[in-house]
Regions:
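A compositional/biophysical signature of low hydrophobicity enriched in polar/charged and small residues
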Residues: 1-164
Length: 164
């Protein structure tokens, strides 16, 4: 039995320095280039060039602040699984709904998984009621987040074809 080889298509060349840069920026995107260079043992201009190349290659796609939604008044977060729904109507609903924090179009029994943030149960009911006009839904309130924003680095070793 042969194992399948999994490789990323159009994978940019990423070396150990780039990997360390990615780890540092994912942990703290506010690092200055000087501090980033100090941490990865490169000069500031060298780090700036590597970051620019990672951005140009689409490896780094943006920088953002992570906020505490509860501190902003959104006391409830929920995952809403949505059955088959018209793609254009769902896309429009997602675009027009500020409560939707993340939205994924997925395979399987559900067509969409939405992460929403709402003020209270009444607000949750209002959002889900609107979604129910588009498709069947199933809602789970998030009790606790155990992992958020996992640092991801390039794969070092690829699976090799091997006879089992």
């Amino acid at each position: 039995m042969k194992r399948k080889v999994f490789e990323m298509q159009n994978k940019p060349e990423i070396d150990a320095f780039d990997t360390r840069i990615l780890a540092e920026l994912q942990a703290d995107a506010r690092l200055s280039l000087a501090e980033l260079g100090r941490r990865v043992h490169l000069s500031q201009p060298a780090v700036a060039e590597r970051v620019r190349k990672l951005e140009a290659a689409g490896v780094i796609t943006g920088y953002r602040a992570t906020v505490n939604l509860a501190a902003l008044g959104y006391g409830i977060r929920a995952l809403v699984r949505v059955g088959r729904a018209d793609f254009a109507r769902m896309s429009r609903f997602i675009d027009e709904s500020p409560e939707i924090v993340n939205a994924w179009n997925v395979t399987g029994e559900d067509s969409w998984i939405l992460e929403i943030a709402v003020v209270d149960v009444e607000h949750l009911d209002a959002v889900v009621s609107q979604l129910c006009l588009l498709a069947e839904t199933s809602t789970s309130i998030i009790l606790k987040t155990l992992r958020q924003h996992q640092v991801m680095l390039p794969r070092v070793k690829h699976m090799k074809e091997a006879a089992a």
